[in-house]
């Protein structure tokens, strides 16, 4: 009997220790997340060169890439030359064991598909792309539809939101088309800019992500649909300046990494109780960037060196710290599955973005080692302190 009791005690202690270890892992370190980059500079027709570029993503600690391709009205299949490039990237990401996400939008905001015919054409294009690229893990439907930079018609003459309902309809059609190709494909919806405002009379009409989510929910409920329209909600949680820490929250209608609770509440109010998950919907931060100061020794690879936008930058050490903070926050946010930084490589024009761990000529920055370490720990669920 004593032996039995001792065995029971030992077993109970072992189980308790295991449970405590699991608790500590969850409470202290968060959950594993995907860490990647949005980077079109890997889109090269030469498979060898594409592979070399993709390998640099692995070197930075990333396990995913997001690339973009363009759709045009009437197009139901990709251009053959573009398809060769996409296949080159898909093969390279597969060989390096990286996930691949493809974002598809149009070159001009007036091309945004708002009619039934246009949306059916876009959905057919996406289905063809998925069949042609069977190793792609997910597809992001459009880019920042809450901005007229990418989705021109935001309001009707009466000042009513017409962008969110049209986008919700596009999501539904494309979701069905992609899932008919493979139920394993992940459909990323939203893909929203972090800021906007409700002013139909503005010369640049936009919507805040807060209002856009609300209007998506209203459109979904009004449609009577009982199936989902997305598997993942994507947000681009840039701060207004690179010097602002990623976790700083917003009091208004903007959304960032520090506004997780507000985002989950919005998604819940929009979709809970319908066929589309809301408060439990996986979330991905698919664009987030922190620009770093370019040293004088590297300026030879850049243009527009006097650009004021190029001055919105922080030291490389701070860039690494802010990326690590973003990974930590995401790992402590239960619904968040991924963070993608923008870019892997700097853009050479200082009037644009210098937010990668590599300079424009693909040389590593001083921030690379710290970003690599943080990314790998985040992927393993060993980075954050969520206590």
Regions found by a protein language model. Give the residues of each.
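Conserved, mostly hydrophobic/aromatic
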Residues: 37, 65, 129, 139, ...
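Noncatalytic carbohydrate-binding groove/subsite architecture in carbohydrate-active enzymes
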Residues: 103, 118-123, 162-309, 313
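Hydrophobic alpha-helical membrane-insertion segments, chiefly the h-region
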Residues: 12-22
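Boundary/entry segment of secreted carbohydrate-active catalytic domains
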Residues: 21-64, 68-70
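Short, acidic/polar
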Residues: 43-59, 118-130, 208-222, 320-329
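Aromatic-rich peripheral "rim/lid" segments of glycoside hydrolase catalytic domains that contact
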Residues: 77, 140, 145, 149-150, ...
């Amino acid at each position: 009997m004593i032996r039995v009791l001792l065995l029971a005690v030992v077993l109970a202690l072992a189980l308790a220790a295991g449970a405590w270890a699991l608790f500590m892992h969850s409470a202290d370190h968060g959950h594993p997340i995907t860490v990647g980059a949005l980077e079109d500079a890997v889109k090269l027709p030469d498979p060898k060169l594409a592979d070399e570029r993709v390998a640099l993503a692995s070197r930075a600690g990333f396990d995913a890439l997001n690339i973009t391709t363009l759709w045009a009205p009437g197009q139901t299949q990709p251009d053959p030359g573009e398809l060769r490039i996409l296949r080159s990237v898909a093969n390279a990401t597969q060989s390096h064991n990286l996930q691949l996400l493809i974002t598809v939008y149009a070159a001009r905001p007036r091309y945004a598909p708002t009619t039934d015919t246009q949306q059916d054409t876009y959905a057919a294009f996406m289905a063809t792309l998925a069949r042609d690229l069977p190793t792609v893990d997910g597809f992001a439907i459009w880019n920042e539809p809450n901005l007229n930079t990418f989705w021109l018609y935001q309001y009707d003459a009466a000042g009513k939101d017409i962008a969110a309902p049209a986008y919700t309809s596009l999501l539904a059609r494309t979701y069905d088309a992609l899932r008919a190709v493979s139920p394993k494909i992940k459909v990323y919806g939203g893909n929203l800019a972090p800021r906007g405002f409700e002013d139909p009379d503005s010369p640049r009409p936009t919507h805040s992500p807060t209002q856009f989510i609300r209007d998506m929910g209203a459109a979904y409920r009004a449609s009577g649909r009982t199936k989902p329209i997305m598997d993942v909600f994507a947000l681009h949680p840039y701060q207004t300046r690179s010097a602002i820490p990623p976790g700083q929250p917003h009091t208004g209608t903007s959304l960032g990494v520090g506004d997780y609770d507000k985002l989950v509440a919005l998604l819940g109010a929009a979709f809970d109780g319908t066929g589309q998950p809301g408060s439990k919907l996986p979330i991905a931060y698919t664009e987030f960037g922190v620009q770093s100061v370019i040293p004088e020794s590297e300026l030879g690879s850049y243009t527009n060196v006097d650009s004021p936008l190029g001055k919105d930058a922080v030291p490389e050490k701070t860039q690494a710290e802010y990326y690590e903070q973003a990974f930590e926050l995401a790992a402590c946010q239960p619904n968040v599955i991924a963070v993608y930084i923008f870019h892997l490589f700097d853009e050479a024009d200082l009037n644009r973005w210098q937010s990668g761990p590599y300079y424009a000529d693909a040389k590593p920055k001083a921030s690379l080692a710290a970003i690599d370490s943080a990314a790998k720990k985040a992927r393993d669920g060993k980075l954050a302190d969520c206590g």
